[in-house]
Amino acid sequence: PRLADAQFDTADDDDDSLEQRIIRFAELSCQKWNGLRQNSNVVSRTALLKALLIAADVAGSALTADGQRPAEWIPRELSARITPELLMPIISKGTKGKEPLPFQRAVGASDKPTTIVIAGCGNGKTTAAYLWAQRHATGRKLWFTYPTTGTASAGYQGYLYDHPDLLSTLMHGRSEVDLQAMQGTAEDDRDDEPLRLESLRAWGKQAIVCTVDTVLGLLQNQRRPLFSFPAIAAGAFVFDEIHSYDARLFGSLLRFLQMFPGVRVLLMSASIPPSRMKVLRELLGDRAGDEIRGDEQMEGHQRYQFEPRDSAESCRMDVTAALAAGMKVLWVCNTVGDAIQTARDAKQWSGVASERIIVYHSRFRYRDRVKRQKQVIAEFEYYTDGEKKGQRVKPGPSLVISTQVCEMSLDISADLMLTAECPLPALVQRLGRLNRYATDDDPWPCLVYPFQGDPYNEKAEWVQTRGDYRASMGAARAAVRELAGQPCSQRDLAERLDGMVDTEQFETFSAWLDDGWLTEASQLRGGDTGITLIREDDLDEIERELGPESSKPSKWTSRLLVPWTIPMLYRRGFQPMRQAGGYPVAARGSVAYSVEEGATWRTNTN
């Protein structure tokens, strides 16, 4: 739309002010876009132009301020691409110097633009992904995406962190804290580095390990991927654990695949529900071949045995017996409140010292959660070579009581598992933490007790606001009931997943594509009434640790405050006392906290 040249007053209260003219221009632009959006070519080209203009602005302003010449810096950085030779040490490390497994070779040999891999634990999916990248990421930048910050950091540390020649980086909102933990030192330079400068680093990397938000956030106009767009446009992509995406995030994945049909993509998971596989097949057509399944022999090992129980309390005798025998026990609850209460009760009846009982969930300060995750992994660690191969590094009993966070962030193998009822895909993921390294038929017990309620709504009247888990919860109960008392394998569970009837609906709105010229960001993941906050109780500690240069609240940035952030369920009536670095500050005493149990609202249950 066009407006004629005119003189006007800049006073905001004038009917013909600059503000009013901007409003009218925006209204006319929206009207024009409503007509243009019917043309798919206009939609895609507008989105590309929007991303390129934003990225160019970021590069131009940041590089000029830094004394760089954009015309020289940009092509030099974007020319950093993967070569097959760079990935050889990573693959050799993953295979321990041996030949890749047949499953891994099959993934590496896939010649389709999009490859779908469905394989359980122990198959070496990550190593298979780097074999795939040798073929499909050569001449491109490799984006290896994970669903959470924890899994992204673990993936980076386990495979790329110490690679001497590969230009790589870890990108997510909390990556600096995790990188400091890997280095074992704190960062001395506390000057704030704007998000745009952080995003520019990806332009010059050959491999980027990140949360899926760093890539798919592009579909919702989120800043980090918009600033990184030239590097994304040069990418090949691995999307791991796609079963964990909620309906909105999975919808953005669908729009990404639709928008970029020529991009090389690897989709991986231990399980993909039929409803998701169906829509992927319809979208991809011949761009994807048959899904590649895990090793047939490995997935056929009888490694689990369901033991239904009437209640959580009826599991206690099994737990005390296992702990008395020096076993490692993993107990998975569906809510943080249940996990904390279960741990408190276990200190009274378990028969082990309280320090052998560890609570692990999402509601810790981020720095404490990182430490807690390392502690849990250390409790279950095995020697991988030498005379002690196959023995626990830390012998003796342990009881880890966790929530859904264990489904992806913990590469551990428990001797006994207990779990509340949960959707079948989640149950399959939880079982990946039990008898993980089985090499033959040797079923270990998984005790399952009843559960109803949030976060797995099964009431029809609440489907619109709380989701619909009726089919997946019913499928899980049927699997436990019908397989109870008999050995079962990953293949048995995969067959039940394939037969699960699910009517899941995906949200495919994209602010980047559908909103045309607008750049307002939209939510990438489904809302869970969550809020990430800082406690007023921690402000004194923050001032001390940040030091004199950054101790003033006016200098606090979101990046500096990440170690003290806590994700909480939103409590009705919550009013932050103020903001710090963009985070709401909860009034002193309103959020109880301990490094052993994490955070809870003082007046409400979680």
Predicted regions and their residues:
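N-terminal accessory nucleic-acid engagement/regulatory domains that precede
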Residues: 1-86, 586
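Walker A/P-loop
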Residues: 111-132
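Conserved Walker A/P-loop ATP-binding site and its immediately adjacent core
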Residues: 140-162, 172-176, 272-277, 336
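Conserved strand-helix element at the start of the C-terminal RecA-like helicase core
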Residues: 141-152, 322-347, 358-361
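Inter-Walker segment of RecA-like/P-loop motor cores
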Residues: 164-221
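Post-DEXD/H (motif II) to motif III coupling segment of the RecA-like Helicase ATP-binding lobe
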Residues: 226-239, 243-295
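Interdomain hinge/linker at the junction between the two RecA-like core domains of SF2 helicases
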Residues: 273-323
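C-terminal helicase lobe and adjacent C-terminal extensions/tails of nucleic-acid helicase motors
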Residues: 341-348, 352-379, 384, 388, ...
